Amino acid sequence: VDRYGPVLSVQIGTAGMEALRPQIQALLQQVAGVEAMVWRNDTGARELEGLPREVSVAFGEVHEPVWIEENGARFGIAPISGQKTGWFYDQRDNRAALMPWVRGARVLDLFSYGGGWGVCAAVHGADSALCVDASAPALASVARNAEASGVGARVRTLQQDAFDACKALREAGERFDVIVVDPPAFIKRKKDAEQGALAYRRIN
């Protein structure tokens, strides 16, 4: 369960919890006191449990983006159309821990998604942040978030595969003081272990 101001984004991945879905929704609606709730039940783990993948609004109305503040920066979240449940809250404390080290630095944010690392770094005094992602919508959100946070002039975007971008930046002689590598899961199943391990070694 992730909360974005007046909106909850909820994901169920197991058949046991799916059976309790009506009760879960009723309790969250009662306890959280929010205006809307989204079911982000589109994870591949549901297929292993024989459950359909779906995204739906449980109640209320959701108008994207929904704005939140994290570590002094503003981010427009897409609970319905974004990745995962809309944002990666699990890295919030790690992002905060990095901020004392970024003042005056050139920052490279690989697999940036909405710029959680790069935009925060710019807000905390980085000279510049380059956010790299293969997704055009993700990079559009980076630009929007940077402008909303007052650091649009110091945040750039590059739409490219992160592996290819690293090679191109190295060949161009680019140098960075801080590099953030926050990739998606390369090993989602046991059969992915060998190739996934190679990918982690390559990107690091």
Model-found features: residue ranges?
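Secondary-structure transition/turn motif
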Residues: 11-16, 94
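Short, aliphatic-rich beta-strand segments
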Residues: 1-13, 76-77
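Non-catalytic substrate-recognition/targeting regions of SAM-dependent transferases
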Residues: 2, 18-88
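Rossmann-like S-adenosyl-L-methionine
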Residues: 60-204
